[in-house]
Amino acid sequence: MVDRKRNSSVISDNEENGRVDKKTKIKDEIEGDEVERDVKNEEANGADTDDKEEVRKDNEEENAENGGGEGDDDDDDDDEAEEEKKRTTTFNFDGVTYSFKERPSVLEEKEGKIEFRVVNNDNTKESLMVLTGLKNIFQKQLPKMPREYISRLVYDRSHLSMAVVRKPLTVVGGITYRPFDNREFAEIVFCAISSTEQVRGYGAHLMNHLKDYCRATSNVKYFLTYADNYAIGYFKKQGFNKEITLDKSVWMGYIKDYEGGTLMQCSMLPPILRYLDSAKILLLQKAAIEKKIKLRSKAHVVRPGLQVFKTNKDAKLNPAKDIPGLAESGWSEEMDKLAQKPKRGPHYNFMVTLLSELTNHPSAWPFSTPVNKEEVGDYYDVIKEPMDLSTMESKLENDKYDSFDQFLYDARLIFNNCRSYNADSTTYFKNATKLEKFMNNKIKDSAEYSHFLDQ
């Protein structure tokens, strides 16, 4: 590093008088630069102001031509309506018109914007480009999978891939799978859609294409795949489940086993049904069921509302006679009274809670089930009215307790029976006393039920 202080000290007085002071020169240069910069900034600001004024005037003129900008909103609404119209498919079944909305991916395919290609490593330029696009998507969407492993399987000639390609040649997503024709199943190795394209239904539409293609071109009837926790939901929607019905001898040792993955299976439908027509097929099934229901029921009939209340708000009606269609539906006053009757008694909730706490108490184990006659031969000779917690639970569930008094009687019966049969030095006697004390404290803590202890 240069020592500036030392260098400046060796300069002679004559040299200082014979040259321009460096500090003064630098200061003048800085001030000159600042003045020049300020001038340039003012000019630039003036130019910006002029430009902004011109843009503002242009915008005002454009808005005036478009009706103040409201025309843009109208155009957007028209575009949305047109999009909805394109997505809606209608058909007629038995004189009734039905409609359903197609996925955006289906619409894009119909318009020729995307296509579904089946590719493998055949060394052609276009196939390799598609496979490379798939490889990049898999590596990005499956970060826990080794990149080299993904590359090896995607380019492997024993594997096939179905890719979603946006024209001319942009890969959006795809599935790489390995078919085992002689064993009638295929293993789905990778399945992913680009993160920017996951809201248009590409995943479901891709799987439907793959199923139809495999059934039409091979003997494959089943799909097997290992799904991670994030993919299980997707595969369930596509007809996969965790129950593997395919015999282990068919697939064991043939598919790749992934640690932490969940093995899932899809059994495909008969070839007479196209998966790509699944939305229409489901709607046809619904229409057929509704037709059968209409033959047996009048629930679909819409009757006019009652007009009597418009003139007389306090009018009294005979429901069966004055309300059209009510009697035909099978309604009766008895049914109405039965429906309004509470299913449980007013004390049910408290009794359920109290019985649950008694059952879970550490001292309750001797009273959980009836006394075994084979273990205690003379018990039922001494105790004429036996009771236990499981019997109380059964009676409570079957609405045998009309009042809390009856419930409390059975609970006390358990403790009294125990103390009558067992000596006061036994564990059974002590447990009965502990559990009864616990029950009394619980009842005492309830303001609504504490008075039962005084009875």
Swiss-Prot record:
Coiled coil: none annotated. The keyword Acyltransferase applies. It is found in: Nucleus. The active site is at E187. Its main location: nucleus. The record marks E187 as: Important for catalytic activity. GO terms for cellular component: nucleus; SAGA complex. Residues 16-29 have a biased composition (Basic and acidic residues). Residues 114-269 form the N-acetyltransferase domain. Acetyl-CoA binds at C191, A192, I193, Q198, V199, R200, G201, Y202, G203, A204, Y230, A231, I232, G233. Residues 342-446 form the Bromo domain. It is an enzyme of class 2 (transferase). It catalyses: L-lysyl-[protein] + acetyl-CoA = N(6)-acetyl-L-lysyl-[protein] + CoA + H(+); (2E)-butenoyl-CoA + L-lysyl-[protein] = N(6)-(2E)-butenoyl-L-lysyl-[protein] + CoA + H(+). GO terms for molecular function: histone H3K14 acetyltransferase activity; histone H3K18 acetyltransferase activity; histone H3K9 acetyltransferase activity; peptide crotonyltransferase activity. Pfam families: Acetyltransf_1, Bromodomain. The keyword Manganese does not apply. One of its GO terms (biological process) is transcription initiation-coupled chromatin remodeling. It comes from the Eukaryota. Its EC number is 2.3.1.48, 2.3.1.-. Keywords: Activator, Acyltransferase, Bromodomain, Chromatin regulator, Nucleus, Transcription, Transcription regulation, Transferase. Residues 60-82 have a biased composition (Acidic residues). Histone acetyltransferase that acetylates histone H2B to form H2BK11ac and H2BK16ac, histone H3 to form H3K14ac, with a lower preference histone H4 to form H4K8ac and H4K16ac, and contributes to H2A.Z acetylation. Acetylation of histones gives a specific tag for epigenetic transcription activation. In addition to histone acetyltransferase, can use different acyl-CoA substrates, such as (2E)-butenoyl-CoA (crotonyl-CoA) and is able to mediate histone crotonylation. Belongs to the acetyltransferase family. GCN5 subfamily. This is Histone acetyltransferase GCN5. The gene is GCN5.
